[in-house]
Swiss-Prot record:
NCBIfam families: kdpC (TIGR00681), PRK00315.1 (NF001454). One of its GO terms (molecular function) is ATP binding. The keyword Nucleotide-binding applies. Pfam families: KdpC. Coiled coil: none annotated. This is Potassium-transporting ATPase KdpC subunit. It comes from Escherichia coli O9:H4 (strain HS). The system is composed of three essential subunits: KdpA, KdpB and KdpC. Keywords: ATP-binding, Cell inner membrane, Cell membrane, Ion transport, Membrane, Nucleotide-binding, Potassium, Potassium transport, Transmembrane, Transmembrane helix, Transport. It is found in: Cell inner membrane.
Length: 190
């Protein structure tokens, strides 16, 4: 019985530290130092939340730039079902899926002159990716320009404006946040 008291005291102490003090402290510091990020990096227009800068959305229609395909369950870009397709590179189903995506993109983008960018036909590991390369966005310019009656130059400038450079110059590549880019497109129509 004498060994039970130190064990129980240690358990209660660690429970308070790891279950109470540490979570409250990290939450408070996160809210203090990084309030926008700690609250989900929400993109707001007035009082309305339009999305998150961290999670892609399923933009459909010719007037929007399309992001990477989502492999989440039930619906595209479902944040409660994050995950990839789990199809191996050697799986014939993956080949069929990619071929179908390429055919659909070719049909939707008949004026695109180069091959379909790889990130437009392959899902990310999370299935929630919100970024594509500026080249993948530029590949879609003819379709979006035609649907919105905008010039290629206007869309090229918009892509450049919303392109983000990697934190370290030689690690990573520039990306475009599709949610922010498409919301900016909608603002052009206002």
């Amino acid at each position: 019985m004498s060994g039970l008291r130190p064990a129980l005291s240690t358990f209660i102490f660690l429970l308070l530290i790891t279950g109470g003090v540490y979570p409250l402290l990290t939450t408070a510091l996160g809210q203090w130092w990084f309030p926008w990020q700690a609250n989900g990096s929400l993109i707001r227009e007035g009082d309305t939340v339009r999305g998150s800068a961290l999670i892609g959305q399923n933009f459909t229609g010719n007037g929007y730039f399309h992001g990477r395909p989502s492999a989440t369950a039930e619906m595209p870009y479902n944040p409660q079902a994050s995950g990839g397709s789990n199809l191996a590179v050697s799986n014939p189903e993956l080949d069929k899926l990619i071929a179908a995506r390429v055919a659909a993109l070719r049909a939707a983008n008949p004026d695109a002159s180069t091959s379909v960018p790889v990130e437009l036909v392959t899902a990310s590991a999370s299935g929630l990716d919100n970024n594509i390369t500026p080249q993948a966005a530029a590949w879609q310019i003819p379709r979006v320009a035609k649907a919105r009656n905008l010039s290629v130059e206007q869309l090229t400038q918009l892509i450049a404006k919303y392109s983000q450079q990697p934190l370290v110059k030689y690690i990573g590549q520039p990306v475009v946040n599709i949610v922010e880019l498409n919301l900016a497109l909608d603002k052009l129509d206002e």
